[in-house]
C-alpha cells in the first residue's frame, strides 16, 4: 500500500505533467523541456516543479522550445536570497541557457513560501521583440 505522502507526490507529479503538456499546446513534451525537468529534479530535489513551455506565445516556429516559465519549490532555497536561488537554477540549466533556451522566467520558492501562494505566475503577451506597445 502507498503511503499518504507518496500518493500526494505521485498526484502532484501527474498534475505537473498534465499542466506542462497542456501549456505547450501540442500535447507532447519535447527534448529541451524534458532535459530542463530532469536537471532541475536532480539538482534541487524539488517538492514542486511546474514547467510551462511558453514558446507558442512568441514569434518562433511552431514546436519551438525557446521560452519557459518554471516554478521550483525546494528546501535547498532556505536562507538564500532570490539571486542565489536563480543562480542555482541557472547552474543546473547552463547547457540549455547557452543553447536552445532564449528566455527562462523563474519562481524559486521555499516550501513555506509556496504554501502561502501556490501558483505559477503568468507572463505578459509577447511584443515580438520590440519595445513598442500594442494598439
UniProtKB/Swiss-Prot annotation:
Subcellular localization: Mitochondrion
Keyword Metal-binding: no
Keywords associated with the record: Mitochondrion, Phosphoprotein
Modified residues (Phosphoserine): 81
GO cellular-component term (any): mitochondrion
Residue ranges of the region described as Disordered: 114-135
Gene3D superfamilies per the UniProt record, alphabetical: BolA-like (3.30.300.90)
InterPro entries for this protein: BolA, BolA-like_sf, BolA/IbaG_stress_morph_reg
Top-level taxon: Eukaryota
Family under the similarity heading: Belongs to the BolA/IbaG family.
Complexes and interactors: Interacts with GLRX5.
Biological role stated in the UniProt entry: Acts as a mitochondrial iron-sulfur (Fe-S) cluster assembly factor that facilitates (Fe-S) cluster insertion into a subset of mitochondrial proteins. Probably acts together with the monothiol glutaredoxin GLRX5. May protect cells against oxidative stress.
Protein name as it appears in the record: BolA-like protein 1
Native organism: Bos taurus (Bovine)
Upper taxonomic lineage: Eukaryota, Metazoa, Chordata, Craniata, Vertebrata
Gene: BOLA1
Amino acid at each position: 500500500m502507498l503511503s499518504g505522502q507518496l500518493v500526494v507526490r505521485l498526484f502532484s507529479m501527474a498534475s505537473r505533467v498534465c499542466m506542462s503538456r497542456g501549456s505547450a499546446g501540442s500535447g507532447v513534451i519535447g527534448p529541451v523541456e524534458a532535459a530542463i525537468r530532469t536537471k532541475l529534479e536532480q539538482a534541487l530535489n524539488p517538492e514542486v516543479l511546474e514547467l510551462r513551455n511558453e514558446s507558442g506565445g512568441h514569434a518562433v516556429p511552431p514546436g519551438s522550445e525557446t521560452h519557459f516559465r518554471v516554478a521550483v519549490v525546494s528546501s535547498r532555497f532556505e536562507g538564500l536570497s532570490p539571486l542565489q536561488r536563480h543562480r542555482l537554477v541557472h547552474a543546473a540549466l547552463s547547457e540549455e541557457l547557452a543553447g536552445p533556451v532564449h528566455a527562462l522566467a523563474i519562481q524559486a520558492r521555499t516550501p513555506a513560501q509556496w504554501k502561502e501562494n501556490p501558483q505559477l505566475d503568468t507572463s505578459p503577451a509577447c511584443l515580438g521583440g520590440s519595445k513598442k506597445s500594442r494598439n
